[in-house]
């Protein structure tokens, strides 16, 4: 997910995207805790996507 794509979305779409990413992060953390997660790099990718969405939301709030 690119920041430029996120900047084109509305605040409501960004909030729903953030909610989906947080749910996905929770599920991945549970899989990691139980030893079921095979691709551990997805945790890092989701965490960075969450940061991107939050950054764009902050930019939109300030503008």
From Swiss-Prot:
A Pfam family of the record is Ribosomal_L29
Annotated keywords: Ribonucleoprotein, Ribosomal protein
Q: Which GO CC terms are listed, alphabetically?
A: cytosolic large ribosomal subunit
Family membership noted in the UniProt record: Belongs to the universal ribosomal protein uL29 family.
Q: Which PANTHER family does the record match to this protein?
A: 60S RIBOSOMAL PROTEIN L35/50S RIBOSOMAL PROTEIN L29, LARGE RIBOSOMAL SUBUNIT PROTEIN UL29C
The record's section on NCBIfam families has: L29
Biological processes per GO annotation:
translation
Q: Which HAMAP family match?
A: Ribosomal_uL29
Q: Which GO terms describe its molecular function?
A: structural constituent of ribosome
Q: Which domain of life is it from?
A: Bacteria
Q: Tell me which CDD domains the record gives.
A: Ribosomal_L29_HIP
Name listed for the protein in its UniProt record: Large ribosomal subunit protein uL29
């Amino acid at each position: 997910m690119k920041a430029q794509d996120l900047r084109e979305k509305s605040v409501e779409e960004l909030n729903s995207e953030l909610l989906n990413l947080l749910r996905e992060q929770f599920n991945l953390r549970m899989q990691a805790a139980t030893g079921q997660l095979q691709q551990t790099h997805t945790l890092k990718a989701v965490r960075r996507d969450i940061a991107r969405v939050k950054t764009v939301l902050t930019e939109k709030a300030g503008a």
